[in-house]
């Protein structure tokens, strides 16, 4: 079995161990250990039936699974358990557990060789977005940096008649409504988007974190929000403020769900309802998050300090109602590890009079 696994290494994203009976723990652990695939493992075992426990019919898979899992633990091989310790292979739980396991495989294998773009540098005043490239690299995640000036230089060199640029202009207009007074700014936005995407493609980038203020607005003349929104909608997560850990978190969520993810701040209390929190960001939500037709505009806070004419490109929208999963990693340099938190809750339909992309959230009762 180990030889068969090794011969198909490039085709195997995970291993499912199914025990119809007690099984052969030594054979199972040797096959997985010697193959050395380092992929996720799911262990499933079948039910016994109370009227079929004679010597010829009993399974003993309940006990066999405990032994197999104990061996996996002894060998330091991570494994995933099923919803119930044992159940029939004809149970609907099996399909659900396999679907969940497939998501685990996508996350593990996707992050193991992920390449995260870092365009520019983080805001000087936001040390919360600092992350350790070395700790990420230890988990197989490579950070690929580029100076923002290189992207802006590439954007400026794009000719107005360039076919790729014209396609991007059309794509943006189909993606969101553009106020007439900002039509002349749209070409700047499109050139920036093309330059970012071309750099990402050339460097095989899976997710990206962008210096979205304030050099871009001051030295080029637009915001980065719609570019990030459109990338995230294409399942290429884009995080603000060169938040590398945020980009990794978004990528993990996208791999798990197969859907766009977004970067939000836990930003405001919701009156005196302590089970709710207002989440927001300037204007980067992917289109599928938003309940209304998207409209492009200027940044709120930065529009006041930098001038609205320099901050066009923000996405305006309110997140549509539904459930959501939240996840965040951070690198702990002092302890030499990557930490994370994970939870779920609800996106409510509560009105909230704040500019930008808004999501009023409520914690899950579970």
Features from the language model and the residues they span:
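Metallocofactor- and cofactor-centric catalytic cores in central/energy metabolism, strongly enriched
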Residues: 1-109, 113-117, 122-207, 347-365
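Anaerobic metallocofactor- and corrinoid-dependent redox/one-carbon enzyme cores
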Residues: 21, 38-47, 61, 113, ...
């Amino acid at each position: 079995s180990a030889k068969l696994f090794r011969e198909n290494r490039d085709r195997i994203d995970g291993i499912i161990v199914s025990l119809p009976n007690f099984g052969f723990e030594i054979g199972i652990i040797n096959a997985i250990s010697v193959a050395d695939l380092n992929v996720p493992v799911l262990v499933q075992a079948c039910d016994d039936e109370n009227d079929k426990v004679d010597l010829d019919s009993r399974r003993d898979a309940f006990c066999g699974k405990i032994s197999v899992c104990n061996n996996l633990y002894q060998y330091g091989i991570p494994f995933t358990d099923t919803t119930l310790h044992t159940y029939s292979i004809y149970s609907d739980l099996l399909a659900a557990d396999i679907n969940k396991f497939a998501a685990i495989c996508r996350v593990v294998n996707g992050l193991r060789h992920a390449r995260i773009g870092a365009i520019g540098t983080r805001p000087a005043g936001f040390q919360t977005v600092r992350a350790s490239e070395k700790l990420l690299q230890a988990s197989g995640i490579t950070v690929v940096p580029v100076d923002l000036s290189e992207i802006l230089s590439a954007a400026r060199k794009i000719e107005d008649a360039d076919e790729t640029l014209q396609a991007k202009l059309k794509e943006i207009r189909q993606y969101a409504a553009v106020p007439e007074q900002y039509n002349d700014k749209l070409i700047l936005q499109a050139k920036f988007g093309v330059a970012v995407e071309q750099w990402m493609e050339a460097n095989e980038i899976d997710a990206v974190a962008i210096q979205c203020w304030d050099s871009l607005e001051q030295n080029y003349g637009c915001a980065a929000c719609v570019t990030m929104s459109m990338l995230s909608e294409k399942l290429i997560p884009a995080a603000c403020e060169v938040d590398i850990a945020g980009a990794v978190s978004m990528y993990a969520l996208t791999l798990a769900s197969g859907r766009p993810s977004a970067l939000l701040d836990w930003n405001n209390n919701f009156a005196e309802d302590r089970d709710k929190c207002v989440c927001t960001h300037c204007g980067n939500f992917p289109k599928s998050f938003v309940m209304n037709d998207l409209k492009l505009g200027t940044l709120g806070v930065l529009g006041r300090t930098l001038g609205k004419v320099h901050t066009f490109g923000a996405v305006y929208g309110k997140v549509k109602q539904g459930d959501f999963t939240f996840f965040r990693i951070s690198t702990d340099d002092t302890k030499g590890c990557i930490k994370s938190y994970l939870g779920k809750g609800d996106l409510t339909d509560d009105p909230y009079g704040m500019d930008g992309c808004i999501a009023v959230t409520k914690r899950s009762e579970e």
